[in-house]
């Protein structure tokens, strides 16, 4: 990428490997952001899908391995690690979830580990995975983003899944009438039926915005933090390619400093996503407003 400008380098690293309907009528991979944009809605971010599935499988395999090797005697390092993680998540669920459900704890564990693994890919040097993709494909211009959580499609997809569970449990616990009443009869109420009828549109607007804000904030918080972190790594990488010795030296220091700080960010963002999911589902299980 030595021939690229700093701007071109940054744009290339922030572009997804997109598969879809090309302008010439064929199906294939986009090589530029303009081609990807022309593909429209029915385009697939292959890198995001691939890494999300791969890291999900890694999570399943690690925990399956730990379960198969679990023993009541002297536990190994993997069993100790998994037990500590499970106890941590279980404690978080017990502290924040006030309903009864056998699904919430496994869901919270899955979310925390999966999001953490997707975030952790950000610690891999920014050029390694794209360069590997170029070597495998034989195309020196093909884009490839490895951090799935820097793609709003991934974070919004996870958030919408949580939103679907919120709606499902709200209706299951409160009934369809109770769910509709929650959206239309609160926060403002009146014993006068005429006044209450007038307040329904206001209540619905306020409650609907509150409801929709949950998945949007959940998705954008994770995306924004991880996208900003990835951008910092890319800007530091630009320093290395500047050709200036002092700037390259500064880049080395910043790379290590930001990587250490980023470990906190990737863990914290996974924890926040998990905790908000637990809190939102706990609210859905509450039988009163």
From Swiss-Prot:
InterPro entries, sorted: ATP_syn_F0_a_bact/chloroplast, ATP_synth_F0_asu, ATP_synth_F0_asu_AS, F0_ATP_A_sf
A Pfam family this chain is assigned to: ATP-synt_A
Compartments it resides in: Cell inner membrane
Mode of membrane association: Multi-pass membrane protein
Entry keyword set: ATP synthesis, Cell inner membrane, Cell membrane, CF(0), Hydrogen ion transport, Ion transport, Membrane, Transmembrane, Transmembrane helix, Transport
Gene3D superfamilies per UniProt: ATP synthase, F0 complex, subunit A
Annotated GO CC locations: plasma membrane; proton-transporting ATP synthase complex
One GO-annotated biological process of the protein: proton motive force-driven plasma membrane ATP synthesis
GO MF: proton-transporting ATP synthase activity, rotational mechanism
Domain of life: Bacteria
Transmembrane regions: 43-63, 101-121, 160-180, 193-213, 232-252, 259-279
Main location class: membrane
Cited PANTHER family: ATP SYNTHASE SUBUNIT A, CHLOROPLASTIC (PTHR42823:SF3)
Subunit structure and binding partners: F-type ATPases have 2 components, CF(1) - the catalytic core - and CF(0) - the membrane proton channel. CF(1) has five subunits: alpha(3), beta(3), gamma(1), delta(1), epsilon(1). CF(0) has three main subunits: a(1), b(2) and c(9-12). The alpha and beta chains form an alternating ring which encloses part of the gamma chain. CF(1) is attached to CF(0) by a central stalk formed by the gamma and epsilon chains, while a peripheral stalk is formed by the delta and b chains.
Family to which the UniProt record says this protein belongs: Belongs to the ATPase A chain family.
Function (record text): Key component of the proton channel; it plays a direct role in the translocation of protons across the membrane.
Protein's UniProt name: ATP synthase subunit a
Species whose genome carries this gene: Pseudomonas syringae pv. syringae (strain B728a)
Higher taxonomy: Bacteria, Pseudomonadati, Pseudomonadota, Gammaproteobacteria, Pseudomonadales
Gene: atpB
